[in-house]
UniProtKB/Swiss-Prot annotation:
Name of the encoding gene: atpD
Function: Produces ATP from ADP in the presence of a proton gradient across the membrane. The catalytic sites are hosted primarily by the beta subunits.
Keywords: ATP synthesis, ATP-binding, Cell inner membrane, Cell membrane, CF(1), Hydrogen ion transport, Ion transport, Membrane, Nucleotide-binding, Translocase, Transport
Positions with a binding annotation for ATP: 155-162
Name this protein carries in UniProt: ATP synthase subunit beta
Family under the similarity heading: Belongs to the ATPase alpha/beta chains family.
Length: 478
């Protein structure tokens, strides 16, 4: 790719929403180059998307274009959008082009990195499987996460994706020596603000000495133009790649929400005049997703474990956007509205959530057998629900009645109080070690706690807490 040695100058010829056409006199800037202009006294970055002929390029604006006029001068930066990386970004909030938006002064980074990078080659990738313990029972037992894997949180609106992501950051940042990067892609500004202040309160961001913080934040919220929302995930990933390569640790990369990345790509695609494909999405949907996801990987230097919230439009998992994401994931955590309606949080569907690690050679026989036994009881309960709805519990055999009773206890035992939800629930959050999770569920499946009431299993940690709650309930009833 040849770059112009002198800075190419051009002028704006057309503005259609977030898409801007720029005509150049001499050498055309390369595709994906960043162009600079000013709008209302503020710097505006444009990214080259198409060469149209007649020395004109079509660009996507990374900020609002209201007030931009034809004839405005534009200069080519000669490189793609580059953002500050390294420890100077810790505890800070950046926007898509790497500018600080937390009102804490400029970022003193010595190094910048282009947001468009190639995925690591085969030789440098690492392939070993190791479980990443989250302290959340339902995840660790039934759909465990792998270090350096990609995890998808699927769910419709309002079933708890963001709260689960916040709890994962909270749990892992506390027990984890590595760094986290959080990319807020097209989600609510209020949530981004709340998250920032929660990080400060919990000590994940050290406001007195920012470089001792454990997380860097990159935001491109709902009110941003589609160009910013389509690129902000790449900005966050670029920060995560730098932490992985420089420190050689396990970096956690959180994206909330990957669907908005697709949605922004679809808006940009329509503005660029591409013919839409299925359900109105961009024809390059799989390519866009692949370019992002293939960069999220473990190398011999370190690993990036990514947790991605994936909004499911109208709760339809066959929609092209969530369906395209499925292909890239190692584990899926599906949040179910039916479970959230029962008041069971986290509302993880124990039968619909999957993991590549569900293998006795990776997890060990005890963990694998316990998980499969739990799923077996829940599956049997699910198949009996139609009979119960039509004929009632009395028509079931004694064995089935016992299965239903155990399944209802297991269902409640899969709930857990969260640290980040303490303001809603009033009860302090708990993290349950993996060995206690396995032992507790093994005992429940074996029928050792058939004598405890259902309510004792709701919103507790391990089985000892359930026993203590049962004793408290018995004392209150006496």
């Amino acid at each position: 790719m040849t770059m112009a040695t002198t800075v190419s100058k051009g002028k704006v010829t057309q503005v259609i929403g977030a898409v801007v056409d720029v005509q150049f006199e001499g050498v055309l800037p390369a595709i994906l180059n960043a162009l600079e202009t000013t709008n209302n006294g503020k710097k505006l970055i444009l990214e080259v998307a198409q060469h149209l002929g007649e020395n004109t390029v079509r660009c996507i604006a990374m900020d609002a274009t209201e007030g931009l006029v034809r004839g405005a001068p534009v200069s080519d930066s000669g490189t793609p959008i580059s953002v500050p990386v390294g420890n100077a970004t810790l505890g800070r909030i950046l926007n898509v082009v790497g500018e600080p938006i937390d009102e804490r002064g400029p970022i003193a980074a010595t190094e910048k990195r282009a947001i468009h990078q190639k995925a690591p080659d085969f030789q440098s990738q690492s392939t070993e499987s190791q479980i990443l313990v989250t302290g959340i029972k339902v995840i660790d037992l039934l759909a465990p996460y792998s270090k350096g894997g990609k995890i998808g949180l699927f769910g419709g609106a309002g079933v708890g994706k963001t709260v689960l992501i916040q709890e994962l950051i909270n749990n892992i940042a506390k027990v984890h020596s590595g760094y986290s990067v959080f990319a807020g892609v097209g989600e609510r500004t209020r949530e981004g603000n709340d998250l920032y202040h929660e990080f400060i309160e919990s000590g994940v961001i050290n406001i007195d000495d920012l470089e001792k913080s454990k997380v860097a934040l990159v935001y491109g919220q709902m009110n941003e133009p589609p160009g910013a929302r389509a690129r902000v995930a790449l900005t966050g990933l670029t920060l995560a790649e730098q932490f992985r390569d420089q420190s050689g640790t396990d970096v956690l990369f959180f994206v909330d929400n990957i669907f908005r990345f697709t949605q922004a790509g679809s808006e940009v695609s329509a503005l660029l005049g591409r013919i839409p494909s299925a359900v109105g999405y961009q024809p390059t949907l799989a390519t866009d997703m692949g370019q992002l996801q293939e960069r999220i990987t473990s190398t011999k230097a370190g690993s990036i474990t990514s947790v991605q919230a994936i909004y499911v439009p109208a709760d339809d998992l066959t929609d092209p956007a969530p369906a395209t994401s499925f292909a890239h994931l190692d584990a899926t955590t599906t949040l179910s509205r039916a479970i959230s309606e029962l008041g069971i949080y986290p509302a993880v569907d124990p039968l619909d959530s999957t993991s590549r690690l569900m293998d006795p050679q990776i997890l060990g026989e005890e963990h694998y057998n316990t998980a499969r036994a739990v799923q077996g009881i829940l599956q049997r309960y699910k198949s009996l629900q139609d009979i119960i709805a039509i004929l009632g519990m009395d028509e079931l055999s004694e064995e089935d009645k016992l299965t239903v009773a155990r399944a209802r206890k297991i269902q409640r035992f899969l709930s857990q109080p969260f640290d980040v939800a303490q303001v809603f629930t009033g009860s302090p959050g708990v993290q349950v070690p993996l060995d206690k999770t396995i032992a507790s569920f093994k005992a429940v499946v074996a029928g050792e706690y058939d004598h405890l009431p259902e309510a004792a299993f709701y919103m507790v940690g391990d089985i000892e807490e359930a026993k203590a709650k049962a004793a408290k309930l018995a004392a209150a009833a006496a």
